[in-house]
């Protein structure tokens, strides 16, 4: 959520920036009308409160003098009723302002390139050289099915399309990737591993920006029958990423600045409805309703957040480097960034069967956008004032997509898969997966 004071002091500039950089049309007249109502009602409530307090004191003095206080009591009661009405109206207007603020995207950092879509993203670097194959390349689906380790038909039978069953050595390789990522981030990069709920309430989803704007992308819980009005309602959402519960750990908290940065990592299943992606990536593991991811989150002091973004992105890159997977690092343009991000790097891994780079990690600095929604603050020792923290998040990495990259980049002519050296300790020393 952007700072409401920006709308009060620089409304036209903010509106122009949102239109230019975010293709978001802010209704300036609506903002002005709500702000005028808020100021008027604020003055009214403060005036009524002051007058009511003054007359309440007069009642005590008049009573001490033995005067008739019935008229004063009636006036105080009337003012009390007027005050309650004014407070109710003020609360309503403030609620409308908050609902409006919750729909406004973050303002990009100055260095973010202007652009409409991913074609105008800026490539920062490439690492590694794509392997040259001397045999016909198979995609991960064919490789996995031939090894009897990837089973999409059973996933459809059990649930629906975009679900999968993994078996045997492929399932173990998938698990090995997640364990390798967790170990590297927790043992070498200084992150604390956290096990979080997969179901979260609406306050949590509002805190990180999934609600109210992206509810259709979430899976929500509800009674299976939906017929009995006496059934207990369970208004929870399945997490689309561990960023949601991890970041919300500091919601409504004031943390000691000496404890910053807070660096958290979690390995979780993630659930996404993939609304609007019909027909895209229908084959394989690239776009699933359920997938696993190792997520990195940092909570930092405001002046440290850009430095932290470089660090976090580099830590995600380290996974790809140790796996010897070619990738490129891309700075997203204004038109391709996420709703709450101020600056985002994407890491895209080379997939031989597609002959292209595909996103495997997105690392973002949210500035104080999420912190303001969550009321997540920090305070220095000896300082009475608090300030909003900055939050960052990134995939370190998406496990399923990393599996895709390993299968395709490490395939052999006979259909076997060479296991990357760093994963062999997690695979009982096995060097290859064979049929």
Curated annotation (Swiss-Prot):
GO molecular function, one term: ATP binding
Residues that bind ATP: 272-274, 359-362
EC numbers for this chain: 6.1.1.11
Catalyses which reaction(s): tRNA(Ser) + L-serine + ATP = L-seryl-tRNA(Ser) + AMP + diphosphate + H(+); tRNA(Sec) + L-serine + ATP = L-seryl-tRNA(Sec) + AMP + diphosphate + H(+)
Presence of the UniProt keyword DNA-binding in the record: no
UniProtKB keywords: Aminoacyl-tRNA synthetase, ATP-binding, Cytoplasm, Ligase, Nucleotide-binding, Protein biosynthesis
Pathway connected to this protein: Aminoacyl-tRNA biosynthesis; selenocysteinyl-tRNA(Sec) biosynthesis; L-seryl-tRNA(Sec) from L-serine and tRNA(Sec): step 1/1
InterPro entries: aa-tRNA-synt_IIb, aa-tRNA-synth_II, aa-tRNA-synth_II/BPL/LPL, Ser-tRNA-ligase_type_1, Ser-tRNA-synth_1_N, SerRS_1_N_sf, SerRS_core, tRNA-bd_arm
Keyword Glycoprotein set for record: no
A cellular-component GO term for this protein: cytoplasm
Broad class of the protein's primary localization: cytoplasm
Annotated binding of L-serine, by residue: 241-243, 295, 395
PROSITE patterns in UniProt: AA_TRNA_LIGASE_II
Places the protein is found: Cytoplasm
Cited Pfam families: Seryl_tRNA_N, tRNA-synt_2b
GO biological process, one term: selenocysteine biosynthetic process
Family the UniProt entry places it in: Belongs to the class-II aminoacyl-tRNA synthetase family. Type-1 seryl-tRNA synthetase subfamily.
Protein function: Catalyzes the attachment of serine to tRNA(Ser). Is also able to aminoacylate tRNA(Sec) with serine, to form the misacylated tRNA L-seryl-tRNA(Sec), which will be further converted into selenocysteinyl-tRNA(Sec).
Record's comment describing the protein's domains: Consists of two distinct domains, a catalytic core and a N-terminal extension that is involved in tRNA binding.
Record note on quaternary structure: Homodimer. The tRNA molecule binds across the dimer.
Name by which UniProt lists this protein: Serine--tRNA ligase
Organism: Haemophilus ducreyi (strain 35000HP / ATCC 700724)
């Amino acid at each position: 959520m952007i700072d409401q004071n920006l709308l009060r002091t620089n409304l036209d500039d903010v509106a122009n920036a949102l239109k230019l950089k975010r293709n978001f049309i802010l209704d300036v007249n609506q903002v002005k009308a709500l702000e005028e109502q808020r100021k008027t009602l604020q003055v009214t409530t403060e005036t009524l409160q002051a007058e009511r307090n003054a007359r309440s004191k007069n009642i005590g003095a008049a009573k001490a003098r033995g005067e008739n206080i019935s008229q004063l009591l009636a006036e105080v009661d009337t003012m009390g009723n007027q005050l309650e009405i004014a407070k109710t109206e003020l609360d309503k207007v403030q609620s409308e302002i908050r609902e409006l603020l919750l729909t406004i995207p973050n303002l990009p950092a100055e260095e973010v390139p202007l652009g409409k879509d991913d074609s105008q993203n800026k490539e920062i670097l490439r690492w590694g050289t794509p392997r040259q194959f001397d045999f016909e390349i198979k995609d991960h689906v064919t490789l996995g099915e031939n090894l009897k380790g990837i089973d999409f038909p059973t996933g459809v039978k059990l649930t629906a399309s975009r679900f999968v069953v993994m078996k045997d050595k492929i399932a173990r390789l998938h698990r090995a990737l997640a364990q390798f990522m967790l170990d590297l981030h927790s043992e070498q990069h200084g992150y604390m591993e956290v096990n979080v709920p997969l179901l979260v309430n609406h306050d949590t989803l509002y805190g990180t920006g999934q609600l109210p704007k992206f509810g259709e992308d979430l899976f929500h819980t509800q009674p299976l029958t939906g017929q009995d009005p006496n059934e207990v309602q369970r208004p929870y959402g399945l997490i689309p990423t561990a960023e949601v519960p991890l970041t919300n750990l500091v919601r409504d908290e004031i943390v000691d600045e000496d404890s910053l940065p807070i660096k958290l990592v979690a390995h979780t299943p993630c659930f996404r409805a993939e609304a609007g992606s019909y027909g895209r990536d229908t084959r394989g593991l690239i776009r699933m309703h359920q997938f696993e991811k190792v997520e990195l989150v940092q909570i930092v002091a405001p002046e440290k957040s850009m430095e932290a973004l470089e660090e976090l992105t580099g830590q995600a890159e380290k996974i790809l480097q140790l796996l010897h997977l070619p990738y490129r690092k891309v700075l997203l343009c204004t038109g391709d960034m996420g709703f709450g991000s101020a600056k985002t790097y994407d890491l895209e891994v080379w997939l031989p069967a597609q002959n292209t780079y595909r996103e495997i990690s997105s690392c973002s600095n949210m500035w104080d956008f999420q912190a303001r929604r969550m009321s997540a603050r920090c305070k220095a020792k000896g300082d009475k004032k608090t300030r909003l923290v900055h939050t960052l998040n990134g995939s370190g990495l998406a496990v399923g997509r990393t599996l895709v990259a390993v299968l395709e980049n490490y395939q052999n002519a006979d259909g076997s898969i060479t296991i990357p050296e760093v994963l062999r300790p997690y695979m009982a020393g096995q060097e290859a997966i064979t049929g």
